């Protein structure tokens, strides 16, 4: 079973440097990230749901809650669109299990569908994502609202004796979570602080007034507010991707892909789950690290409210994210493991978190492997024209593919996310090892170094390992 680890942000006194506090990365929670999806059912949500279901193996899906928003004030629970997608998922589930045994059975997902707040009057007239920003006036009072099955389910999940964070993805409005937090505070005062501290909301804009209410009255909850999904993943941002959609989804053969309702990539809500995929970027551990779902900074005046830094922090990952999505779409139609591509595996026996002193040599190394056979077909499509110019044939390539087709390639680079603002000089020692000399610092600083390993098959898939090096003064 895949394991996902969460960073517990604590401080301790380092034994190697008395009286110097350094981040402790030794305490970890084992298990997959717990996620709740709240969706208002509009077109982008339906496309994002197709994408999401193919990553259900990477997460523990605790609830899918149908809600409303300022764009879909009545919600869409009356339309069985989720049930229809799950029926299609059920058709491809046997093949998906071949490629990863952790894919949840369809009935497991059906059991966690709930209806949340779809009351139009709970969304104030005239509000806009352009004005409902961190610090906006509170316009709603969830104490006046009725409970819903969705809000009650959120309460149940947060009260469970499980220390893992609960990532609440707000594809639409936040009101269902706002009601849950209000009930939690009033009816479970002794459990409230422990429970609310586990809540992490990823909001695709504030699409109602619930986010502002949570900021003020439930500051123990963490909010990640994304605006830069617009211009990267949303409607119209990738209008030149129609070939991708027609070839891999709307091709008349894909049971789930046919529910992708747009003619091009149109998934404004997809960033809400991309950072919870177990790809090695560790974006789930801290919103400032960054990953496929963007990178965030803390908003001034708030302890737990963050906004995404830029469009570029999302756009730089679109290509590997879509290649990975393409591979999983192909898993749906491929009953034999060896006939599809899978991401390389990276193992770091010595651990990803290192503490050193200024001036010390830091060596980072990993073990990279790819279980898939060499992709002769893909290699010939990519480079066959060059080999043919030298008199080679495809049969020549098939004779000894391991000698002519690389198993994988890798890159190393310094990444944003660390506190050290200078640059380091990485010295490469092959595909799986680099070193550098720890720079001079006056106080403990962190440097993030990323290993990116990608295979040479089609579609190319990428895995990562993020090393976090804490540098202490001499």
Enumerate the language-model features and the residues they cover.
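C-terminal motif of bacterial Sec signal peptides marking the signal peptidase cleavage site
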Residues: 13-16
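Charged, cofactor-coupling segments
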Residues: 463
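Short, solvent-exposed loop/turn segments at the edges of extracellular beta-sandwich modules
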Residues: 454-460
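N-terminal acidic, glycine/proline-rich low-complexity segments
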Residues: 19-427, 433-435, 441-450, 466-472
């Amino acid at each position: 079973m895949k394991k996902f680890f969460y960073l517990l942000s604590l401080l301790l006194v380092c034994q190697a440097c008395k009286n110097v506090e350094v981040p402790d990365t030794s305490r970890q929670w084992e298990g997959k990230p717990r996620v709740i999806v709240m969706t208002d059912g509009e077109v982008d949500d339906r496309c994002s749901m197709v994408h999401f279901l193919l990553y259900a193996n990477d997460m523990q899906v605790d609830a899918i809650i149908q809600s409303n928003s300022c764009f879909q004030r009545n919600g869409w629970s009356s339309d069985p669109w989720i049930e229809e997608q799950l029926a299609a998922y059920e058709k491809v589930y046997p093949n998906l299990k071949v490629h990863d045994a952790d894919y949840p059975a369809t009935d497991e997902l059906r059991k966690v569908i709930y209806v949340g707040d779809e009351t139009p009057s709970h969304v104030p007239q005239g509000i806009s994502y352009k004005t409902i920003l961190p610090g906006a006036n509170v316009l709603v009072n969830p104490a006046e609202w009725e409970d819903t099955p969705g809000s009650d389910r959120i309460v149940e999940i947060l009260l469970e004796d499980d220390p893992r964070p609960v990532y609440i993805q707000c594809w639409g409005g936040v009101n269902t979570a706002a009601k849950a937090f209000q009930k939690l505070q009033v009816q479970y005062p002794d459990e409230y602080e422990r429970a609310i501290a586990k809540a992490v909301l990823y909001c695709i804009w504030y699409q109602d007034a619930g986010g502002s209410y949570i900021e003020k009255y439930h500051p123990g909850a963490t909010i990640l507010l994304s605006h830069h999904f617009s211009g990267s993943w949303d409607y119209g941002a990738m209008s030149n991707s129609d070939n991708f959609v027609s070839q891999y989804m709307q091709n008349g053969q894909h049971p789930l892909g046919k529910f992708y309702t747009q003619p091009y990539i149109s998934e404004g809500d997809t960033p809400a789950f991309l950072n919870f995929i177990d790809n090695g970027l560790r974006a789930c551990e801290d919103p400032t690290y960054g990953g496929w779902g963007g990178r965030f900074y803390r908003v001034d005046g708030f302890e737990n409210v963050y906004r995404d830094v830029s469009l570029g922090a999302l756009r730089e990952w679109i290509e590997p994210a879509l290649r990975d999505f393409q591979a999983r779409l192909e898993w749906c139609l491929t009953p034999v493991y060896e006939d599809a591509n899978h991401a390389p595996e990276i193992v770091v026996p010595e651990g990803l978190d290192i503490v050193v002193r200024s001036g010390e040599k830091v060596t980072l190394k990993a073990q990279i492997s790819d279980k898939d056979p060499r992709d002769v077909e893909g290699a010939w499509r990519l480079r066959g024209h060059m080999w043919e110019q030298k008199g080679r044939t495809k049969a020549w390539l098939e004779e000894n593919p391991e000698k002519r087709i690389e198993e994988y390639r890798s890159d190393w680079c310094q990444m944003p996310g660390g506190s050290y603002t200078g640059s380091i000089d990485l010295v490469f020692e092959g595909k799986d090892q680099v070193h550098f000399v720890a720079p001079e610092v006056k106080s403990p600083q962190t440097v993030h170094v990323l290993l990116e390993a990608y295979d040479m098959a089609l579609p190319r898939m990428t895995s990562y390992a993020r090393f976090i090096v804490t540098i202490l003064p001499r």
